[in-house]
Amino acid sequence: MREATVERATAETWVWLRLGLDGPTGGKVDTGLPFLDHMLLQLQRHGRFLLEVEARGDLEVDVHHLVEDVGIALGMALKEALGDGVGLERYAEAFAPMDETLVLCVLDLSGRPHLEFRPEAWPVVGEAGGVNHYHLREFLRGLVNHGRLTLHLRLLSGREAHHVVEASFKALARALHKATRRTGEGVPSTKGVL
């Protein structure tokens, strides 16, 4: 079973995270930030992953450090759980609607970190539970850099912050589920490695 557990501690945060790509799903999520917990549960449910997270951070300063470091820990666990990439689907895309909002996520488990996401171009109003689409960028940046994947996230319609962030997590979850499936033999690259 492809699974990884990571622990990350800094002067600002502490994160313990367990990710399982196959087998049982679910798991307890408690970051001390209820909206982030809600988003991680979307990732767990719609990605059909085992995802357990326990985290604490300097929320009295800002949510930025905690959101970013949970993304970093998730990226580290994803990279470890994927191993050498043998048999991976590798590429995937997913749309996620939520009322007026529509988000597209396209990713490649390439071993090359790149994030294509411009929240300043998103006409989003407000934030949800202390989290906004700029915090989403920091989460994704941590995931991409430490998971070593290429990720494109596009807002096709929507303005309400809660819907935009939640649809983004759902699209990411669905794309990650597809890309992490084992559907072939060998490494899906002409280079022979990811």
Swiss-Prot record:
GO biological process assignments: L-histidine biosynthetic process
Catalysed reactions listed for this entry: D-erythro-1-(imidazol-4-yl)glycerol 3-phosphate = 3-(imidazol-4-yl)-2-oxopropyl phosphate + H2O
Cellular component GO terms, alphabetical: cytoplasm
Alphabetical UniProt keywords: Amino-acid biosynthesis, Cytoplasm, Histidine biosynthesis, Lyase
Coiled-coil features, chain-numbered ranges: none
Main location: cytoplasm
PROSITE patterns: IGP_DEHYDRATASE_1, IGP_DEHYDRATASE_2
Pathway: Amino-acid biosynthesis; L-histidine biosynthesis; L-histidine from 5-phospho-alpha-D-ribose 1-diphosphate: step 6/9
Family the UniProt entry places it in: Belongs to the imidazoleglycerol-phosphate dehydratase family.
Official protein name in the record: Imidazoleglycerol-phosphate dehydratase
